């Protein structure tokens, strides 16, 4: 049969239409529920992660106070506004694995606000008494966090704009919106909402707190004090591989499940969320749908460290060298025995010894699971997605392991190879001479430094906001990364890689 347009009217038909049965929401939506969560940055990951947890709470446990209002702050978010708006804010999650593909329609996003159309509506929504949580997936660059000083980038033009009292009703940044909404709640005698980062950063809650409190102190110390004393910013570890949706994915959804969806989400079956139980104005029972809610922030930090150093660090080891070698997808890289050995040995020999033991977690089994997930050919995870915004990733996923390895005199040559590959990747030309797009908020500065440095890392390492001062003065590190850069420049990735495999 012809595919059915995804919307409320067609849900019952969609549930019975495709070759494989599709799960659809049977819970109340629209005006019958309260939107207790406002989420900033509705992309693929949010729709495959937090929105799925909330969908399960609504479907299995009858939760009606925590539907999601999505928010887009950037002009490019108009595409998500239009896609969701055209289908009653429903969308399809397609889980792919060796066992096959499974689809279910998610209805936890109840509405969507596009800030460039109406900034006041976003502030009012956050400030509304029904809003208990404002969650974020705004990527590393959206936090205006200086990796070197660990402070707010208060001189950034957008932050400077939002700090002007005259601009409080027309902010540009997430922190401008959060502050404006919290200031209203303070004036109205309401509790502050919880600010819940779902971004892939270590100590994401602590960083969010520090950035927002720093912003608030520059605007109004009294409100900053209130946020510091009564606000909540839970730390969390989030995990689910979610590639960019392709036209092929939409066609497959129509062919196999008879659904016409403007913007479905493709993901893997695996999903994990470890979150600190720190909420200022209530929360839904996330633990009932598989989230690991922990009391101790230290527990979250240990899970975060495992995930960021092993999964995300390995993604970097796949992404930048893989792009230079001419691959397109993660699974293609892992099908190459050189790469699969390299990634395994980097995890086992250089990263694993630096990680804390977590009761009940077998690191070797976790590493094996990661190799299996990376090798999944069905989700078609694109290397450009892995390589996106590297200036916010490499300082978190690779450099801390190098610094710790130096401190304990451990091995780190493979980690240096990854950093060197990124330094070459910055130029936007692969080993065959083919150009590719470098999507990074610091691209111009990085490319200028890369051109000036050639095969020397010195120019790039001089960017203090990314690398600080310590590594530049370490002879072992400079020798290793310089050697890797020279080898890659001379021989290319595939001929250099065997030197880093035992």
UniProtKB/Swiss-Prot annotation:
Q: Which domain of life is it from?
A: Eukaryota
Organism phylogeny: Eukaryota, Fungi, Dikarya, Ascomycota, Pezizomycotina
Function statement: Catalyzes the NAD(H)-dependent interconversion of D-fructose and D-mannitol in the mannitol metabolic pathway.
**Which Pfam families did the record assign?**
Mannitol_dh, Mannitol_dh_C
Q: Which GO terms describe its molecular function?
A: mannitol 2-dehydrogenase activity; mannitol dehydrogenase activity
Q: Where does NAD(+) bind?
A: 37-48
Q: Which UniProt keywords apply?
A: NAD, Oxidoreductase
Q: Which reaction is the catalytic activity of this chain? A: D-mannitol + NAD(+) = D-fructose + NADH + H(+)
GO CC entries:
extracellular region
Known partners and oligomeric status: Monomer.
Q: What is its EC number?
A: 1.1.1.67
- This protein is called what? Mannitol 2-dehydrogenase
Describe the family membership recorded for this protein in Swiss-Prot or TrEMBL: Belongs to the mannitol dehydrogenase family.
């Amino acid at each position: 049969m012809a595919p059915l347009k995804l919307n409320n009217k067609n849900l019952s038909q969609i549930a019975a239409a495709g070759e494989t049965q599709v799960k659809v929401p049977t819970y109340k939506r629209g005006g019958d529920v309260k939107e207790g969560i406002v989420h900033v940055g509705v992309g693929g990951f949010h729709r495959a992660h937090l929105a799925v947890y909330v969908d399960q709470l609504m479907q299995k446990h009858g939760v009606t106070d925590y539907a999601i209002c999505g928010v887009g702050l950037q002009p490019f978010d108009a595409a998500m506004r239009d896609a969701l708006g055209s289908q009653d804010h429903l969308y399809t999650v397609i889980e792919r694995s060796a066992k096959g593909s499974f689809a279910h329609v998610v209805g936890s996003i109840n509405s969507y606000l596009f800030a460039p159309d109406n900034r006041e509506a976003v502030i009012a929504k956050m400030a509304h008494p029904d809003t208990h949580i404002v969650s974020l997936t705004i990527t590393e660059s959206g936090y205006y966090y200086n990796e070197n000083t660990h402070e707010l980038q208060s001189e950034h033009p957008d932050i400077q704009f939002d700090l002007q009292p005259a601009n409080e009703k027309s902010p540009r940044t997430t922190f401008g919106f959060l502050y404006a909404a919290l200031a209203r709640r303070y004036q109205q005698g309401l509790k502050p909402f919880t600010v819940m980062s779902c971004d892939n950063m270590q100590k994401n809650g602590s960083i969010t707190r520090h950035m927002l409190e720093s912003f608030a102190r520059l605007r109004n110390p009294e409100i900053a004090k209130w946020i510091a004393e009564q606000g909540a910013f839970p730390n969390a570890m989030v995990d689910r591989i979610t590639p960019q949706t392709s036209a092929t994915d939409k066609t497959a959804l129509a062919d196999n499940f008879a659904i016409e969806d403007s913007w479905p989400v493709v993901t893997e079956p695996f999903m994990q969320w470890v979150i600190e139980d720190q909420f200022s104005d209530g929360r839904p029972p996330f633990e009932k749908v598989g989230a690991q809610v922990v009391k101790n922030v230290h527990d979250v930090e240990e899970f975060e460290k495992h995930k960021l150093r092993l999964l995300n660090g390995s993604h970097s080891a796949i992404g930048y060298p893989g792009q230079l070698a001419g691959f397109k997808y993660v699974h293609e890289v892992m099908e190459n025995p050189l790469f699969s050995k390299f990634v395994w040995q980097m995890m086992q020999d250089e990263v694993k010894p630096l990680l804390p033991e977590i009761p009940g977690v077998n690191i070797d089994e976790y590493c094996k699971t990661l190799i299996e997930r990376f090798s999944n050919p069905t989700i078609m995870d694109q290397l450009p997605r892995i390589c996106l915004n590297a200036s916010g990733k490499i300082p978190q996923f690779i450099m801390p392991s190098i610094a710790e390895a130096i401190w304990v005199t451990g091995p780190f040559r493979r980690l240096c190879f990854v950093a060197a590959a990124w330094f070459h990747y910055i130029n936007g030309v692969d080993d065959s001479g083919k150009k590719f797009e470098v999507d990074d908020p610091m691209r111009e500065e990085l490319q200028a430094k890369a051109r000036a440095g050639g095969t020397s890392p010195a120019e790039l390492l001089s960017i203090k906001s990314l690398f600080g001062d310590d590594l530049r003065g370490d002879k072992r590190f400079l020798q290793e990364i310089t050697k890797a850069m020279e080898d890659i420049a001379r021989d290319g990735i595939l001929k250099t890689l065997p030197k880093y495999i035992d």
